[in-house]
Each structure stands twice: as C-alpha cells, then as structure tokens.
C-alpha cells in the first residue's frame, strides 16, 4: 500500500495538453466473474465486497480522526458563534482554555463511529451498485448510470448512519459540552439500544440522514462522473496506459472536486445535527427558526476545507487499498458497443 502512495506522489497525468482520451471498455455485466490473472478476488464476489468494506474502514476511520481538531472548531462555531468568532479565533480560544490536548477531544468516538460508517458506506455501495445494475439491461444501465450511483449511495448511507449516529452524538457532546469526557462514547456502546443513553443519542438520526444521505449521494455520483470526465477530456492518455500512481492522482483530484460539492449540499443539516446533539430539548424546527437562513451556513468555510480534503483522501486511500490488495478496479463507464452502433446508424453519434 505504501509503495502505491509513494508512486502516486511522484506521478501526475495532468502534465500534457488537454486532449480527448479513450476509456477502457467496461466488463460486460456487473455480476461476479472469474478473477483475471493477478487479481486477488472475483469482481462482485463476497470476498470483493468484504475487502471493499475494509477499504472503507481505513479510508473513513483514519481521515475523520486526522481532522478532529478542525472538526472540533467547526462544531463549536456552529453551536456557540458568540464565543467562537471564526476558525482562527476558535483555535485560539480552544487552545487557551484546554491546551493543545483539548483539540483532540472526541477522537475515540470519531474513529470508532466513522470506521463503522466507512464499512457500510463503501462496502454496501459496491453491493447495491452491482445489484441495481443487474436489474437493468446493459444500455439502460449505461444511460442511467448516474441514477444508479445516486440510488446505491443513498441505500448504503441509510444503513451506515444507523451505525454512526450514537457515536456521532457522543462526539459532539464531548467537543461542545464542558465536563463531558471521552468515556461517553464507551457508555453509549455499553448501554445498547434499550438504554436511555443510546435512545437519546439516536434522536438525531433523522437529521443525520438529512445531512449524510445527500452528502454521500453527491460524494459517489460526482466522483464517478468526475473520474469519467477527467479520463475523457483531461488526462492525455487512456486509463489503461496510466500507471497505478497516475490513476491514484486522478482519484485524488476527482475526490477533492466531489468533496467541495458534498460540503455545500450537506452543510445546513450538519449545523442542525450539531445543535440537536448539544441541546437535548431542541427540535429541528426550533433550531432552524432561531438560526435563520444565514445561521445554518455558519462554519461553511472550514467545512469545505475539511470535507474537500477528507473526501479526496478517502477516495485515495480506498483506491490505494484496492491496488495494495490486488482487487479488480473496473474502468470508468463507456458506451456499450450495441448502443454505439445503433446511434451511429441513426446519425446521432
């Protein structure tokens, strides 16, 4: 894996002129198929999906934990704008009151919660994408591929947020409420669904869906389409001729572009979730009414930086894990030959 990262750091396919490039022809159908020589598993097999889940654990758990200090300041900006004026001021006040160690508050529930979320988000996305594609014929699957990405990612995130919600609530309380300690997350996990701490922590599940499902739909659909467009219009050679490192650079670039859009579409719901987890008596309506239109966008700047970087790194790590484990990595979608011939005969291509 680390050799892949080093190779990517030294590679960049964007040095040439802007010329169209051919994409590799996709495999016919999305069902599990025999593993080509060199691959560690069959595409669409149980092992393939399990390894995708492992990649999700690493990509989400590591990256979200790495940006805990920025996330802490972002949450405090959202819940106490009078005290924390901006990002720089938020860091200064936090360090002055709690020291540098205070910037790591909430790291444990962040790591556990987002690792579980990553397992479901990436693993189930691959499962649902294959299943939904198999429900369609080849031409329909290609024509409506963006809708397949949207449906698969929304389905995966629905389950991922059920795993994340209790630990996300614990994280926000640790970061924004004085006196709340790290063991809050452990207590939530030990209580289980039937106990009060768990029930209170899941009250923000619906707003969390409101934040994360649009975020994830944008994250996956925008990434898939951006990769497709980069190889078609920007990268000066076909994907098959790119080294693994160059392919990972394209992955990182597409991930960052997707991350910017993710942050924008999900930010109002993110603000509401932070407020709900801070104040157990608040409702979605009361929070939106109190904050107003401008208030729900508070903290968007640092969140764009955080989510853009996070999303790029997550896709990079996820793809690097696939390279490291020698997993099948299908190329971007290309028009089926039957569809191409039909459109050419009709003079539409």
Swiss-Prot record:
It is a multi-pass membrane protein. It is found in: Mitochondrion inner membrane. Gene3D superfamilies: Mitochondrial carrier domain. Keywords: Membrane, Mitochondrion, Mitochondrion inner membrane, Repeat, Transit peptide, Transmembrane, Transmembrane helix, Transport. One of its GO terms (molecular function) is phosphate transmembrane transporter activity. The keyword Magnesium does not apply. Its main location: mitochondrion. GO terms for cellular component: mitochondrial inner membrane. PANTHER family: SOLUTE CARRIER FAMILY 25 (MITOCHONDRIAL CARRIER PHOSPHATE CARRIER), MEMBER 3, LIKE-RELATED-RELATED, SOLUTE CARRIER FAMILY 25 MEMBER 3. Belongs to the mitochondrial carrier (TC 2.A.29) family. This is Phosphate carrier protein, mitochondrial. It comes from Choristoneura fumiferana. The lineage of its organism: Eukaryota, Metazoa, Ecdysozoa, Arthropoda, Hexapoda.
């Amino acid at each position: 894996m680390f050799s892949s990262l080093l190779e990517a750091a030294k590679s960049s396919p964007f040095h040439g002129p802007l010329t169209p490039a051919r994409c590799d022809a996709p495999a016919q159908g999305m069902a599990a198929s025999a593993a080509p020589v060199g691959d560690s598993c069959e595409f669409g097999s149980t092992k393939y999906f399990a390894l995708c889940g492992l990649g999700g654990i690493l990509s989400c758990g590591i990256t979200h934990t790495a940006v805990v200090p920025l996330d802490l300041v972002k949450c405090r900006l959202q819940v106490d704008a009078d005290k924390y004026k901006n990002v720089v001021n938020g860091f200064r006040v936090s360090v002055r009151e709690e020291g540098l160690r205070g910037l790591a508050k909430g790291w444990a529930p962040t790591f556990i919660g987002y690792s579980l979320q990553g397992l479901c988000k990436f693993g189930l996305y691959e499962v649902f994408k294959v299943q939904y594609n198999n429900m369609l014929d080849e031409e329909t699957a290609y024509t409506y591929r963006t809708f397949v990405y949207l449906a698969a990612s929304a389905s995966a995130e629905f389950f991922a947020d059920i795993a994340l919600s209790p630990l996300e609530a614990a994280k926000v309380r640790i970061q924004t409420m004085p006196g709340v300690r790290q063991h809050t997350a452990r207590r939530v996990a030990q209580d289980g669904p039937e106990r009060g701490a768990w029930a209170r922590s899941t009250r923000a599940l619906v707003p969390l869906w409101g934040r994360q499902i649009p975020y994830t739909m944008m994250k996956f659909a925008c990434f898939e389409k951006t990769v497709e467009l980069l190889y078609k219009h920007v990268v000066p050679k076909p994907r098959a001729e790119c080294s693994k490192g160059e392919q990972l650079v394209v992955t990182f670039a597409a991930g960052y572009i997707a991350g910017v859009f993710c942050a924008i579409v999900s930010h109002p719901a993110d603000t509401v979730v932070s407020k709900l987890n801070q104040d157990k008596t608040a409702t979605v309506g009361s929070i939106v009414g109190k904050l107003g239109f401008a208030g729900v966008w508070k903290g968007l700047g640092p969140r764009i930086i955080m989510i853009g970087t996070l999303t790029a790194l997550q896709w990079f790590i996820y793809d690097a894990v696939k390279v490291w484990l020698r997993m099948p990595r299908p190329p971007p979608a290309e028009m089926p030959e039957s569809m191409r011939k039909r459109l050419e005969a009709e003079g539409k291509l």
